[in-house]
Amino acid sequence: MAWVQLRLNSTNEKAEKISEYLEEIGAVSVTFMDSQDTPIFEPLPGETRLWGNTDVIALFDAETNMQQIVRLLQQKNHLDENTAYKIEQIEDKDWEREWMDNFHPMKFGKRLWICPSWREIPDENAINVMLDPGLAFGTGTHPTTALCLEWLDSLDLTGKTVIDFGCGSGILAIAALKLGAKSAVGIDIDPQAILASYNNAEQNGVAERLQLFLSEEKPTDLQADVVIANILAGPLKELYPIISNLVKPQGDLGLSGILSTQADSVCEAYQGKFTLDPITEREEWCRITGKLNSFV
């Protein structure tokens, strides 16, 4: 069967609404790509997409009147004269198989692997987290998630407590538990993230050691030995009083979701209470880690 593809550029704020409308008017699938043509495959809702602009790609039956589709988008103000778009015929493929073929087991640090459920585990003796990609954020494909996973792998988490602030898919909390943490807490503003984290924890056999809270429902006295927050620079600075108070004395803090150009301003917010390590960078993103000062 032949297909026709519509590709248009959008802001992150509009991409979800455009996707929903495209499905309403007949798209058989809608996917997102970042500006480097990298699929934004992430496992279930729960975290903020970190790309500034997103290409929305819709697949239609070849018989679809694409000019009518364009007119409908224009009528809904999803497409205007300043929006670039492209329509093209594409060859028939096994799209589900091609999607699955994009994902392979990934290694982070010395011990940790993230593996889709349909792939063979590369190393039975390693720490293996089974996680299937969906359309949210947090499988390890983004540099910030990778940086966080590598940091967790570098720590001795044996018997430690961990808080994953902005847990999304739960990937960081689950990885920490598999790496030896005694217990973990996941916190998020999105109920779907809480559900996704629980389901992923169950799949990995660690659900009984993971507590999950919506942000407004977390205990007021909650603290942990290790706190990790992979969100965005703005919220990290705004939520500094809350995040910093989650760390136990002499505890470890890891922050990501930060562009390298934003690192100094985030460090400035946290350096009064934490002794910070050298910043770790990857592509245009970075990770900030440190230890709570004993005199605080």
UniProtKB/Swiss-Prot annotation:
Q: Name one GO molecular function term.
A: protein-lysine N-methyltransferase activity
Q: Which reaction does it catalyse?
A: L-lysyl-[protein] + 3 S-adenosyl-L-methionine = N(6),N(6),N(6)-trimethyl-L-lysyl-[protein] + 3 S-adenosyl-L-homocysteine + 3 H(+)
Report which residue ranges the record marks as coiled coil: none
Asked whether the UniProt record includes Phosphoprotein among its keywords, one would answer no
Q: What are the protein's UniProt keywords?
A: Cytoplasm, Methyltransferase, S-adenosyl-L-methionine, Transferase
Compartments, record wording: Cytoplasm
Which superkingdom heads the taxonomic lineage of this protein's source?
Answer: Bacteria
One cellular component (GO) term of this entry: cytosol
One family name in Pfam for this protein: PrmA
Q: Which InterPro entries match?
A: Ribosomal_L11_MeTrfase_PrmA, Ribosomal_PrmA_MeTrfase, SAM-dependent_MTases_sf
Task: Return one Gene Ontology term, BP aspect.
Answer: methylation
Into which family does the record put it?
Belongs to the methyltransferase superfamily. PrmA family.
- List the protein's name: Ribosomal protein L11 methyltransferase
Organism name: Histophilus somni (strain 129Pt) (Haemophilus somnus)
Biological classification of the source: Bacteria, Pseudomonadati, Pseudomonadota, Gammaproteobacteria, Pasteurellales
